[in-house]
């Protein structure tokens, strides 16, 4: 297997987790196995253990220093996993906070993970807005299509910066409404 660490990113509601899970399921049928790790879940485990958050979406509102410390601890845990098997990390390129965009993979996390590839899952802002409005399982801040598109632009910028710093390739995968299988096939084609 040529990829030891692959990072799959996207704004909340774009469907990056769904695309990644479906791709992993199909790759297993081909005897290609990645360990799936959700960076936010790893961070939430740390935050919950420290009594800093009771639900995952509260982490966005923690002060930046606390978020950075939690990121570093989660990055170390994932780096340990990648020493034993290829890892696909489900995360966000950037996290929108009240004080601005926080890099999802700052230098101290990138240095640990050293990804081979960064994948950015995207679609139109209005599609994401509609998906978010229909998802009652999450406590998300309401945003406009324009602010979602700005967030996707910031994700692209961050992904390229991650590539510059690590030598990772950057791939954009489109996840249009009703065409998730196309996005899955596009992701699989670069993970083989």
From Swiss-Prot:
Stretches that traverse the bilayer: none
Binding site for ATP: 10-18
InterPro entries in the cross-refs: Adenylate_kinase_AdkA, P-loop_NTPase
Record GO cellular component, one term: cytoplasm
Compartments in which it is found: Cytoplasm
Domain of life, source organism: Archaea
EC number of the protein: 2.7.4.3
GO molecular function: adenylate kinase activity; ATP binding
Reaction equations catalysed: AMP + ATP = 2 ADP
Assigned keywords, A-Z: ATP-binding, Cytoplasm, Kinase, Nucleotide-binding, Transferase
Subunit structure: Monomer.
Database matches in HAMAP family: Adenylate_kinase_AdkA (MF_00234)
Family the UniProt entry places it in: Belongs to the archaeal adenylate kinase family.
Protein name per the record: Adenylate kinase
Originating species: Methanococcus vannielii (strain ATCC 35089 / DSM 1224 / JCM 13029 / OCM 148 / SB)
